[in-house]
UniProtKB/Swiss-Prot annotation:
Function recorded in the entry: Removes the phosphate from trehalose 6-phosphate to produce free trehalose. Trehalose accumulation in plant may improve abiotic stress tolerance.
Domain of life of the native organism: Eukaryota
Broad EC category: hydrolase
SUPFAM superfamilies tied to this protein: HAD-like
Span list, region Disordered: 1-21
Family: Belongs to the trehalose phosphatase family.
Cofactor(s) this protein cannot do without: a divalent metal cation
Taxonomic path: Eukaryota, Viridiplantae, Streptophyta, Embryophyta, Tracheophyta
Protein name: Trehalose-phosphate phosphatase A
Primary gene name: TPPA
InterPro entries in the cross-refs: HAD-like_sf, HAD-SF_hydro_IIB, HAD_sf, OTSB-like, Trehalose_PPase
Catalytic activity: alpha,alpha-trehalose 6-phosphate + H2O = alpha,alpha-trehalose + phosphate
Induction and repression of expression: By trehalose.
Length: 385
């Protein structure tokens, strides 16, 4: 499809405090502060130097709140009755949160589309927790055929990209739609559809023959691959005796899942990770939904990936463009913030069944509501003629 000319309109209360005495993550492994980090000139100004700090944070997790953060990183599932209605007393709190702060993108759909009229929509979607449910086994996070059909249909009318923390190859395997843009490793591995281009102003954009076709790739962290491969092997070896742990290779980052690890062994998981990466100052440790992630220290995130893709589509800094980003994870907040505060004004839509603070404008409860939203976009576009 013509991504440039064919679209006339186109917990997070995340973490209570945990003490370092209970979980001894060394302070020099805590990630950089974006305010304190300084870019150095080489490598397209992407590599950052990381000042050593006496105290620090693991992303937005206070350094004295590690174990509690691990406990609260994935809320328990809401129990539904036979009519799929929540029996949880906190459901009232959720409805109040939705009504007062983050209105449903479904009930607000007409309002969103009134703003979209005459604009070209660009759509960005997270994968896990957005297009597929969060599952116990990461390798089994399959999207339904109905969801795949919804994504395929919406991509007929709007340029569409999947931006995931997974490796690009893995998320492509799950989605299996060649007409999309894919950004794996939290946006550090971007691939265009066949016949479409990426922003060639960046020196790291290359053309390759992959998956039976010519595609363009942008990989701002490519020089980190040997280091990440080495750390991956070490993490697999050091955690092999911890029952339930899974080390996932996401190419430009590594995920250590502890969702299936007994809680009494969580500190052991974290200590194993720290023991491996303590000698790698160019890597940082972040925290997600029952997962520890190791990433390169570069000035790149999902928000910058959105801007890069908009540039590639010829849609950057255009008043007649409406970017929409749908995601459920804290890493999606960088994209929400770009659309809220940056020149590419658009709408972030948070997927969450629990109240949390966000940079998003709207909310959806779960992947089933995401699918309904995508179908509504298609219906709206078709009605416009």
């Amino acid at each position: 499809m013509d991504m440039k000319s064919g679209h006339s309109s186109p917990v997070m209360t995340d973490s209570p405090p945990i003490s370092n005495s209970r979980l001894t993550i060394r302070q020099n492994r805590l990630p950089y502060s974006s305010a304190a980090a300084t870019a150095i000139s080489q490598n397209n100004n992407l590599l950052l130097t990381v000042p050593r700090k006496k105290t620090g944070i693991l992303d937005d997790v206070k350094s004295n709140g590690w174990l509690d953060a691990m406990k609260s990183s994935s809320p328990p599932p809401t129990i539904l009755n036979k009519d799929n209605l929540s029996n949880d007393a906190t459901d009232m709190t959720y409805r109040e949160w939705m009504q007062l702060k983050y209105p449903s993108a479904l009930t607000s759909f007409e309002k969103i589309m009134s703003f979209a009229k005459g604009k070209r929509i660009a759509l960005f979607l997270d994968y896990d927790g957005t297009l597929s449910p969060i599952v116990e086994e990461p390798d089994c996070a399959y999207m339904s055929s109905a969801m795949r059909s919804a994504v395929q249909n919406v991509a007929k009318y709007f340029p569409t990209a999947i931006i995931s923390g997974r490796s690009r190859d893995k998320v492509y395997e799950f989605v299996n739609l060649s007409e999309l843009y894919y950004a794996g490793s939290h946006g550090m591995d971007i691939m265009s559809p066949a016949g479409e281009s990426l922003n060639h102003e960046h020196s790291r954009t290359v053309s390759v023959y992959e998956q039976g076709k010519d595609v363009n790739l942008f990989q701002p962290a490519s020089e980190f691959l040997p280091m990440i491969d080495k750390v991956l092997c070490s993490l697999i070896e050091s955690t092999k005796d911890i029952k339930g742990v899974k080390v996932e290779d996401n190419k430009f980052c590594i995920s250590v899942h502890y969702r299936n690890v007994e809680e009494k062994n969580w500190t052991l998981v974290a200590q194993c990770v720290d023991d491996v990466i303590r000698t790698y100052p160019k890597l940082r440790l972040t925290h997600g939904r029952k997962v520890l992630e190791i990433r390169p220290v570069i000035d790149w995130d999902k928000g910058k990936a959105v801007t890069f893709l908009l540039e590639s589509l010829g849609l950057n800094n255009c008043e007649d463009v409406l970017p929409i980003y749908v995601g459920d994870d804290r890493t999606d907040e960088d994209a929400f913030k770009v659309l809220r505060d940056g020149p590419n004004h658009g709408y972030g839509i948070l997927v969450s069944a629990v109240p949390k603070d966000s940079n998003a404008f709207y909310s959806l409860r779960d992947p089933s509501e995401v699918m309904e939203f995508l179908k509504s976009l298609v219906t709206w576009k078709r009605s416009m003629g």
